[in-house]
Amino acid sequence: MGLTWKQRVFTALLGAAAVSGLTALLLVLVGTMNVLLPPDTKFGIVFDAGSSHTSLFVYQWPANKENDTGIVSQALACQAEGPGISSYASNPARVGESLQGCLEEALALIPKAKHHETPMFLGATAGMRLLSRKNRSQAEDVFAAVSRALGQSPVDFRGAELLTGQDEGAFGWITINYILGLLVKYSFSGEWIRPLEETLVGALDMGGASTQITFVPGGPILDKTAQATFRLYGADHTVYTHSYLCFGRDQALSRVLAELVQASTGLLIRHPCYHSGYRGTLALASLYESPCAPAAPPDLSQNLTVEGTGNPGACVEALRKLFNFSSCDGREDCAFAGVYQPPVQGQFYAFSNFYYTFNFLNLTSKPSLSGANATIWEFCLRPWKLVEASAPPGQDRWLRDYCASGLYILTLLVEGYGFSEETWGGIEFRQQAGGADIGWTLGYMLNLTNLIPAEAPAQGWAQSFGVWAAGVVFVVLTLAATLGAVAVQVFWLQD
């Protein structure tokens, strides 16, 4: 006996449900691809504890990294209130307060869920190097106070560290070459590529207490103590680097004034680097607080009166006495003070006080060496009243020193480092590039990400839209056929 028409309907619906369900299953199995989900984002915080102030930088990078070094970008820059941490030597308990404002900004930027896994570092530079030389116990107290204050934050504080001058120079070199895409670039084909070594640029950094020069020389580095080697993005780099402690802008200009005091017989000092018409007073003792200063006179209780004479020629002669150029006579591989340096070559980026001074003097548009020299001399010859009247807002603190600073930079770069009219055009005076500040902190963060284990990117399953839509249709048909078969079974076949 054959099937009734109701049974045939029931059988057809079951068959349709089976075919549709099998088709949907095949689409799921065959049309699905294994894909990489967008990588998670990691964050890092670095405090730059300089001689005159402290800055905080927040960096971010994807958790899956290129050859074990994070692809890092700057997310926040903040200048802390107050002077540098070395200024709190007599009252270290207050140093933590000066850092809290910027730390709170950083914590607000970073998602709370990531606070506990965010590493935070503080690197101190020449200001603390000088304090450590002058009074190691006070320096240790300052570092201990910093560690206590930052250790209470919800992030992963890794400690406060005194950077060597060589580290400061090398990390600055890493920063600028990374920002310019000279260490690694993302190609149109979606791959990370490394440009040629010949395109790498040198770094010229000047803080308040020290100055650094770092570059890849044209030949071997003969003095291995001036060599730094590190690995980034799967490639090894070797650079010449040297840091001159006491040759930062603030310390150098303070030393010039101290030398003028020693050459004077009274308390009225005529300063050739200050504009004519300038007159100011300062405590004599303030010139001898730093280990960079010459021997102090027996009586430091008096005040000095300083008058400017606006004599750039005499100013240059006073500045040249700082360098001890005669110790390099007859040597092509010597900068000053007997320090080994290969001849400069290639392009350089000059930042920090190099940039601040030349930006004020409108010299960042790459004038010739003779043009820069003429501009600075013309500025030094201006009367103080004219300089004050034409100064932009917010420059009162540094205004008297721009003449001396400009001439000091020229003397350092030309007579010290050996730049000439021909190589001068290779210097770029910049403070930012690629959306990030130029300095040692980004290079420091890039180097430290080698210590953070690389994470495999998260994986998931994905389909093209067409396959997904077809699968949905067949799932709906399967459900409809199944429900139809159930209805036939319940309402028809039970009759």
Curated annotation (Swiss-Prot):
GO terms for cellular component: plasma membrane. The chain crosses the membrane at residues 9-29, 467-487. Signal peptide: none annotated. Residues 1-8, 488-495 are cytoplasmic. Gene3D superfamilies: 3.30.420.40, Exopolyphosphatase. Domain 2. Pfam families: GDA1_CD39. Residues 30-466 are extracellular. Glycans are attached at residues 303, 324. Its cofactor is Ca(2+); Mg(2+). Disulfide bonds join 78-102, 246-292, 328-334, 380-403. Keywords: ATP-binding, Calcium, Cell membrane, Disulfide bond, Glycoprotein, Hydrolase, Magnesium, Membrane, Metal-binding, Nucleotide-binding, Transmembrane, Transmembrane helix. It is a multi-pass membrane protein. The active site is at 168 (proton acceptor). Its main location: membrane. Its EC number is 3.6.1.5. Belongs to the GDA1/CD39 NTPase family. Canalicular ectonucleoside NTPDase responsible for the main hepatic NTPDase activity. Ectonucleoside NTPDases catalyze the hydrolysis of gamma- and beta-phosphate residues of nucleotides, playing a central role in concentration of extracellular nucleotides. Has activity toward ATP, ADP, UTP and UDP, but not toward AMP. This is Ectonucleoside triphosphate diphosphohydrolase 8. It comes from Bos taurus (Bovine). The lineage of its organism: Eukaryota, Metazoa, Chordata, Craniata, Vertebrata. The gene is ENTPD8.
